[in-house]
Every structure is written in structure tokens, then in C-alpha cells.
């Protein structure tokens, strides 16, 4: 038996020398092929989808960065800074009306008329300041999310998918069951969405299986199509199947991390029965987690199963 196992391992090593599997087009900057049949289907993490899976996961992080930029720009701290800056600019330059107009509306009309050029220049000054702040904030968020992408790429996807994607692509087939924990949606022969799960070894026990969503998302244009809801449904069903195939107790949990500014995903989770558990401030970036209060929230869904009695 030991000899057979050794031969299997040697066989796996030899697979790495085999030519890589041709990859499905993974470009995210190209429109879908209109000549391809308009069919939609799902697959697990097959070797030919390795590059596409990595690209999609990185794109999900960039989408989170875009949401973070929007959150930062309209944050109360930034709005207060811009308002104070505008007041500091206008206060010494504004000329107040001398004549009594007899009405509040008339007084404000004269105020605006007299200070028309000053107000316009103040708005230009504010726009320049806002542009500077937006550039600065974009760099702050870029450094944080770029580090997340670097971690994903540096681990060859193993951090998210539980398998080295380079090794997966180098094989023409894989029997590793971990590939079944990833669900990819393909439309017009192009991967457009995916979700991946992994057992949470820290929280799982013999009595309680805990599964964690490691990545979930879709191409930006399909966010409002309901495809995220379908991915969450698959995650719930797949988690139940894993629990059924193992020797676990009567409870199971499905967990997912969500950024505090991602209101769209949180609304979807609420509809699916998930509840907020806890949150922690982003510690890798002091500005994001400290000044702007960006948090990573943990949401979860708990399942209860009836005990199976065997005669």
C-alpha cells in the first residue's frame, strides 16, 4: 500500500511537467463575445478556469476599493473639512448688504448678487480642495487594497481557493475535492461570477461545522442582476452537503466577512437570513480603520438539523 501511495505522489509530481491547460479567456476589460451562444451554466474550479478565477477574485477586491473611495469621499470628516475651508475662504471676502430690503429672501438675494464673483471663486477653491483630498484618499485606499491583491496573487490563489492555481493549471485534471468548493458562473462562454468556500478549521468542531466564504462577487455590470443571491444560495446548499457527507452534529454555520461600507452585500445577506455577529476595525491601515472607521463585519447564518436516529 505504501508503495502504491508513493507511486501516486510521484505521478502527481510528473503532472507538473505536463503542458499547462489552455485557459478560458479571463480578460475583464473586454465585452462578452456576442457570437457565443447565450447560455449560462456553472462549473467547479476546473484547470481551464484557474486564471479566470484569480482575475475575478482580484477584480472583486478592486470593486471593494471603488466602494471604499466613495465612502471616504462622502465621509462626514471630509465634508466638514471642505465646509470649514470654504468658510475660511469666504469670510474675509464677503460684503454684506447695507440697505434693508424688508425681507429675508430679499436680503439673501442682494448678498448673493453682491458676492457673485466671490462665491464662484470659493466654489472653485472648494472643488480644487476636494480634488486634492480625493487623490489623497484614493492613494490611502489603493495601498490597502493593493496589498490584498498582492496577497492573493502571491499565494497563487491558495489563500482563497485552498489550492495553488499554478499547480491546478499545470494538470489536465485534478481529483482534489477542494475544487468542488468553488462555484463559477459562465455566460456566453465567459466566467462572470464566482464564490468559494472553505471549512473554518479554527471554529469547526466535531459537533459544529463552520464554513467560511473566502470570496464572492461578479462582474460589475451584473451586480444588480440577482446573481450574487444565486451564489449565496449555492453556498448554503453546498455547506449542507458537506455537513451531510461528514460526521458532524446538529448545527452548522456559514460565515462571511463584509466591509462596513458594502451596503449592497449586507442587504443581500439580510434577505438570505444572515445576521450581524461582530465587527473589528481595519488594523492594516490606521487612516481607514482609525480616522474613517472602516470595519470588517462578520455575518453568519446558522442551521439546525434533526438528529438522525439509527435502529
UniProtKB/Swiss-Prot annotation:
The chain crosses the membrane at residues 71-91, 118-138. It comes from Saccharomyces cerevisiae (strain ATCC 204508 / S288c) (Baker's yeast). Residues 1-31 are annotated as: Disordered. Residues 92-117 are extracellular. Involved in the uptake of inorganic phosphate. Residues 1-70, 139-311 are cytoplasmic. GO terms for molecular function: unfolded protein binding. One of its GO terms (biological process) is protein folding. One of its GO terms (cellular component) is membrane. This is Inorganic phosphate transporter PHO86. It is found in: Membrane. InterPro entries: Pho86 (IPR024297). Keywords: Membrane, Phosphate transport, Transmembrane, Transmembrane helix, Transport. Coiled coil: none annotated.
Amino acid at each position: 500500500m505504501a508503495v502504491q501511495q508513493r507511486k501516486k505522489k510521484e505521478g502527481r509530481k510528473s503532472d507538473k511537467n505536463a503542458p499547462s491547460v489552455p485557459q478560458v479567456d479571463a480578460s475583464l476589460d473586454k465585452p462578452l463575445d456576442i457570437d457565443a451562444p447565450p447560455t449560462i451554466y456553472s462549473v467547479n474550479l476546473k484547470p481551464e478556469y484557474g486564471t479566470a478565477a484569480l482575475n475575478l477574485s482580484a477584480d472583486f477586491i478592486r470593486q471593494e476599493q471603488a466602494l471604499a473611495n466613495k465612502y471616504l469621499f462622502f465621509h462626514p470628516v471630509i465634508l466638514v473639512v471642505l465646509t470649514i475651508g470654504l468658510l475660511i475662504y469666504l469670510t474675509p471676502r464677503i460684503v454684506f448688504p447695507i440697505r434693508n430690503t424688508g425681507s429675508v429672501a430679499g436680503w439673501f438675494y442682494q448678498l448673493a448678487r453682491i458676492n457673485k464673483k466671490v462665491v464662484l471663486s470659493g466654489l472653485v477653491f472648494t472643488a480644487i480642495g476636494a480634488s486634492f483630498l480625493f487623490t489623497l484618499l484614493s492613494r490611502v485606499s489603493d495601498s490597502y487594497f493593493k496589498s490584498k491583491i498582492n496577497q492573493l496573487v502571491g499565494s497563487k490563489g491558495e489563500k482563497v481557493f485552498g489550492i495553488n492555481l499554478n499547480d491546478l493549471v499545470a494538470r489536465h485534471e485534478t481529483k482534489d475535492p477542494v475544487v468542488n468548493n468553488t462555484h463559477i458562473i459562465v455566460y456566453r462562454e465567459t466566467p462572470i461570477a464566482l464564490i468559494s468556500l472553505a471549512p473554518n478549521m479554527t471554529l469547526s468542531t466535531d459537533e459544529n461545522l463552520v464554513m467560511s466564504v473566502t470570496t464572492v462577487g461578479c462582474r460589475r455590470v451584473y451586480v444588480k442582476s440577482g446573481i450574487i443571491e444565486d451564489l449565496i444560495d449555492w453556498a448554503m446548499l453546498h455547506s449542507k452537503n458537506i455537513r451531510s457527507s461528514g460526521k458532524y452534529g446538529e448545527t452548522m454555520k456559514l460565515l462571511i466577512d463584509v466591509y462596513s461600507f458594502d451596503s449592497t452585500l449586507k442587504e443581500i445577506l439580510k434577505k438570505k437570513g444572515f445576521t450581524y455577529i461582530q465587527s473589528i476595525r481595519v488594523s492594516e491601515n490606521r487612516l481607514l480603520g482609525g480616522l474613517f472607521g472602516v470595519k470588517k463585519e462578520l455575518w453568519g447564518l446558522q442551521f439546525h438539523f434533526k438528529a438522525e436516529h439509527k435502529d
